[in-house]
Amino acid sequence: MTLTKQDAVNQMMGFFQSKTLITALSLKLFDHLRDQDRNAKQMAALLNCPLRSSEQLLIALQAMGYLEKQDGLYHLPQEHRAFLVSDEPQWLGWLGRHIDTFLYPLWGELKAAVENDTHQRQTVFGDDRSWFDILYQNPDDVTDFQEFLGKFAAPFIDGFIQDYDFSQHQAFLDIGSGIGSLPIAVANAYSGVNLAICELPQTSTFLRDKLVQQGYGQRIQVLEGDVISGDLPIGDYDLIHLGWMLHDYAPETQLIILKNIYDAMPVGGRFIASETPLNADKSGPEFTALLSLNMLVSTDGGIESSPQEYLSRFHQAGFSNARIMDISGPRTLIVGEKTTHNNGSSQC
């Protein structure tokens, strides 16, 4: 692939577009155009912002394609409302707030992260605690994080439900489930599978409330556990899933997590990790490669890996029949089974 100088300029200036859209979402600008078209003066009054700067923002959003304009009135196309209006299920404002609060400041220190091969939490937040300890100290930040992950997971969940037969299992435990989107989808498609979610204590209350709001409070149980410490309430669950989480940790910590899950699993159980791995030759894809840099600036050694690297860790942790399973959608499944009892280890 050959890129031009203009391609480079466009990529270097890409944050202009990002900040424009995030600002509009933060102001809930699109909410005011859901039911009727409005002119710049009306929008400025509703946003409680000066007319000149409001019009500058509206012009930019029109130029980017999010708004249309006719006879001086700005219009929000119907097909954009699902992800731009704040009370819609797929609203992207959760992601926008997370980017503004955490990711954008951290990425401002990418050069230092590369030079020193370490996260930039101390520089940005004045706090050397873990990424998740910083994130979970504010309930609003937890909500933003879990909500946008739930939105991100939708295409993966559709593919997982379509291509994997959950009916072969009696009980399914989803570790780190966000807003519970995957277990909810399994509940809707497989009435005979017992369902539970394992979450950190800091997020379990949020998740229980979310499940009750959606009508799944009785159908899906919420358990508390920790993959790092090994305090995992896996019990007799014969299918365990860890979604888009291994990459948050350094390879040596990933191995600890995998061993803890393996030790807690019942014999005959199956474990699946879903990730967006690098290509086998580590040439991309672009999103995963950039996500790996996001792990660099924010986490303690988190990194994206190739399928073979994930499989190697599965084998080291003790899993049998470790393999890659391709499904529809953006993620890949890394699958392994437990076929023998632990040597001297105790079950949860």
UniProtKB/Swiss-Prot annotation:
The keyword Methyltransferase applies. InterPro entries: COMT-like (IPR016461), O_MeTrfase_dom (IPR001077), Plant_O-MeTrfase_dimerisation (IPR012967), SAM-dependent_MTases_sf (IPR029063), WH-like_DNA-bd_sf (IPR036388), WH_DNA-bd_sf (IPR036390). Disulfide bonds: none annotated. Its EC number is 2.1.1.-. It is an enzyme of class 2 (transferase). Keywords: Antibiotic biosynthesis, Methyltransferase, S-adenosyl-L-methionine, Transferase. Pathway: Antibiotic biosynthesis; prodigiosin biosynthesis. Disruption phenotype: Cells lacking this gene show an orange phenotype and produce norprodigiosin. Pfam families: Dimerisation, Methyltransf_2. GO terms for molecular function: O-methyltransferase activity; protein dimerization activity. GO terms for biological process: antibiotic biosynthetic process; methylation. The active site is at H247 (proton acceptor). S-adenosyl-L-methionine binds at E199. Involved in the biosynthesis of 4-methoxy-2,2'-bipyrrole-5-carbaldehyde (MBC), one of the terminal products involved in the biosynthesis of the red antibiotic prodigiosin (Pig). Catalyzes the transfer of a methyl group from S-adenosyl-L-methionine (SAM) to the hydroxyl group of 4-hydroxy-2,2'-bipyrrole-5-carbaldehyde (HBC) to yield 4-methoxy-2,2'-bipyrrole-5-carbaldehyde (MBC). Belongs to the class I-like SAM-binding methyltransferase superfamily. Cation-independent O-methyltransferase family. This is S-adenosyl-L-methionine-dependent methyl transferase PigF. It comes from Serratia sp. (strain ATCC 39006). The gene is pigF.
